[in-house]
């Protein structure tokens, strides 16, 4: 039986087309996702935590639109490089808060150089994980926070042409099948979304009781 429930509306805080594409896939049929208004400028992401940066982005949208806003922030954490990425992952090659993101290729090149300088060769020495935090800020002042994590390691060289960011370097563990050593950039969208930090975070959002038909969504 087809449900006639009206989907709750969220405004997406991200203007990154790669992220928006993934978010649309992950929330399809769960919410009505509106694009970020073009007139809203980029937010200076100067918080000390992923949650803090995500909140800054969501609140900027909420204050302009008056509608519930969803934002995410992602950090990569590399065991051999403590404190170097994390909240600064997207601007790793140019760590200025006013630069929300630096070119993907520059970030990947810096990471490979840093691990090479430390003579990290084995998968264990190149261990890393991603964390994505997703926040929904509501007009009534409430908020919902979920997260997702994906463990893996950094490949010795870029592989694959799909995805974005560090996808050509990150090998998730476990993969799709036993012994799978593919990077995210070598996987299909469905395979990546099943394993990735962002996929897990947004599935946690999509399955939250707040989005069920039996509960009232704060301010559609």
What would you call each of these model-derived segments?
Residues 2-11, 17-220:
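Anionic-ligand binding patches
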């Amino acid at each position: 039986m087809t449900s006639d429930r009206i989907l709750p509306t969220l405004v997406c805080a991200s203007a990154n087309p790669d992220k928006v594409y993934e978010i649309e896939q992950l929330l399809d049929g769960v919410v009505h996702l509106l694009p970020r208004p073009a007139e809203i400028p980029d937010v200076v992401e100067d918080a000390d935590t992923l949650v803090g940066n995500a909140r800054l982005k969501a609140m900027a949208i909420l204050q302009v639109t008056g509608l519930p806003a969803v934002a995410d922030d992602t950090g990569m954490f590399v065991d051999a490089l403590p404190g170097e990425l994390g909240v600064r992952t997207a601007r790793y090659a140019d760590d200025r808060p006013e630069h929300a993101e630096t070119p993907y290729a520059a970030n990947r090149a810096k990471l490979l150089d840093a691990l090479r300088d430390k003579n990290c060769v084995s998968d264990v020495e190149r261990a890393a994980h991603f964390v994505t935090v997703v926040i929904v800020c509501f007009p009534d002042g409430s908020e919902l926070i979920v997260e997702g994590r994906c463990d893996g390691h950094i490949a010795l060289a870029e592989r694959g042409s799909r995805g974005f960011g560090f996808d050509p370097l990150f090998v998730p563990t476990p993969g799709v099948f036993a012994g799978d050593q593919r990077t995210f950039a070598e996987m299909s969208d469905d395979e990546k979304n099943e394993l990735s930090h962002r996929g897990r975070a947004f599935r946690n959002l999509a399955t939250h009781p707040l989005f069920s038909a039996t509960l009232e969504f704060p301010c559609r």
